[in-house]
Regions:
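Intrinsic-disorder/low-complexity, polar/charged segments enriched in Ser/Thr/Lys/Arg/Asp/Glu/Gln
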Residues: 70-72, 120-124, 161-163
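Solvent-exposed residues in well-ordered beta-strands and their adjoining turns
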Residues: 61, 78-80, 94, 126-130, ...
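Intrinsically disordered, low-complexity Pro/Gly/Ser/Thr-rich segments with frequent PxxP/GP/PP motifs
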Residues: 99-137
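Terminal connector regions
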Residues: 128-169
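Short acidic, flexible loop segments centered on an aromatic residue
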Residues: 82-99, 105-107
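Secreted, periplasmic, or luminal enzymes acting at the cell surface/secretory milieu
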Residues: 4-86, 92, 146, 150-154, ...
């Protein structure tokens, strides 16, 4: 296609913008729904399967972290259905009483695992503390707020199996 073709009507250039400009700022998609307490029809990460899973024995390696450390989230995924399947474990993090506008929770890690029927697998997801930073427009730099955070573990933004409180020192 060239400009000459569209100029002489040999092709029809639609003239439509193929990009999307969001007005929600940082609260796009599931972040908007969660932060504004709006229940969507399907949460982020929701999906259907021919089998059923449960998440259990969910923990972090500790509850206090320094800036150079990693948060290790461990959980087990059991397939309680009759056929083999795959499940995605999702880890979200939220900052309590943030001094800046932030989403209630943000996806920080995930892992897809295959689990045979009536079996379970252990899942480890590591999140560097530096991934909890926010962008400060005034200083044009990334900053990490110290204090309390909540780790949300589940298989979608609306299906949270456990919440764990941690502290960044």
């Amino acid at each position: 296609m060239c400009i000459r073709d569209s100029h002489y009507g040999e092709i029809s250039y639609p003239g439509k913008n193929n990009s999307q400009l969001y007005k929600e700022d940082i609260l796009v998609g599931y972040r908007w729904h969660d932060t504004k307490n709006i229940i969507p029809s399907f949460g982020f990460g929701h999906g259907l399967s021919y089998t059923t899973f449960e998440l259990f024995d969910i923990n972090t390696n500790k509850n206090k972290y320094r800036l150079n450390e990693k948060i290790n989230v461990v959980c087990k995924v059991r397939n309680i259905g009759n056929v083999e399947g795959k499940e995605v474990v999702q880890v979200y993090v939220g900052k309590e009483n943030s001094k800046v506008e932030r989403a209630k929770k943000e996806l920080k890690g995930f892992k897809k695992v295959k689990v045979s029927s009536n079996e379970y697998v252990e899942v480890n997801i590591n999140i560097p503390v530096k991934e909890l930073a926010y962008y400060d427009e005034n200083s044009a730099s990334w900053k990490i707020e110290k204090g309390d955070y909540i780790i949300y573990i589940g298989n979608s933004s609306r299906a949270i199996a456990k919440e764990i409180k941690i502290k960044i020192l």
